[in-house]
Amino acid sequence: MQGYVLDINVARDEDLWVGVLTSSKMARLYRFYGARHSVIQIGHKIDFEEEQEGAIPRLRRVMHLGFVWERDNHRRYWWQQYLRLLYRHLRDVEEMEGFYYALLDQASRRLERQDAKRAILESHAALLEYEGRSHGLERCFLCEGKLGEEVALARGFIGAHPECVYGRGIEKARIEWFLREKNSTHLSDLEVEELWKILLQGV
């Protein structure tokens, strides 16, 4: 079985509870500490076995399926940031469709050749559409007034007047195109940084 490590918590001594997103579920597995065990980090794609002993499912025979870009500390850090956010979003879900696993597979391939923040933001736009949260930018979610040519964005990339959320305005047409096409090539680095700050508020 393969999956992405989204969460790690110390149980006792050096044993761990590990949250692994697979193509069909969010597995929460117990890993006993062992000197010969490979290191597990959030963001790793792993091949593993799930072993059921009593009431506690165990994580066994773990192999890290590494990516070349993981050698880049910045890329790895941003990837880990997003996966932590994704875990908070999915932690109460047990069984799920393969969309989320496929999304991370696609994003991890993009990270080989694309700016990390742009790759992750484009994947996040696809997630919003899949979950039915890719709202239009016609009205401010706070005052419900019609939005103009510049909009500010809140968590989940929902639109608002800049003055309503005390946020930076971004050209609405550019954001609409980004959300529709899941493509950030037309966005400036400053706009990407603004979207990244919003993403860090939560999935």
Task: Locate each region found by the language model.
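Non-catalytic alpha-helical scaffolds and adjoining flexible linkers that form interface surfaces
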Residues: 1-14, 23-203
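SH3/SH3-like beta-barrel fold
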Residues: 18-20
